[in-house]
Amino acid sequence: TNKKGLCGLRNLGNTCFMNSIAQCLSNSQELLSYMLSNKFKGELNEDKEEADLVNNWNILVRNLWHKNATYTPNNFLRSVQSLAIMKDRGQFTGFQQNDSQEFLQFFLEMFHNAVCKEVTMDITGKPRNDFDKMAIDAYKNYVDFFKNDYSEIVKLFYGQFFTRIKTIKDGKEECSRSFEPFNMLSLEISKNSDGNYDLESCLENFTKVENLETDKENTVKYKEVKFWSLPRILV
């Protein structure tokens, strides 16, 4: 076949947790384009200790997409192990099996640290309605988190939750709201109305209204979580 990206990765010990994440990320088109276009080179801070990981990731990705064969990611693994020692993440310093989700979190964090930069984020215009006010609050939250260290990883992998707490006491209702960034979802596996499992049912279950316990008399409290914005790559 002439199709690219059909390259396999050899395990180095029990490193299938790393290889599976590498294959998933290398087939994420937005992140792949960021690497193959060399855009990352203009943002990479070579003085940072995480830079070696990104450079070896670049080599790994190009080998995965250069020809259909089997590639041994020795240098990439060594950069992971070296950085794990520096960051006191002992689970990634050897050749033992590990959790793929934990490795993905570690890799994205290190990648972000290597290419992040301070950016200017301004809020302009006046709110015309309640939705505009919510949008401003959401953007302020986004600015607070990322104005000093924004990166392509944030752009691709981060979304925002919108959480509303409703309290009803003696017939009077009060609401509070907050925004929070996220880059991974932990979903409970849920069946749909047909008895089958699907992603939509899992997301609906994640965002259902929750009745919160309270020790106050004549008081009812509810919590509702919604997605304000979704990342381009949802994990």
Where are the regions that the model predicts?
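UBL (ubiquitin/ubiquitin-like) substrate-recognition surfaces
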Residues: T1-V235
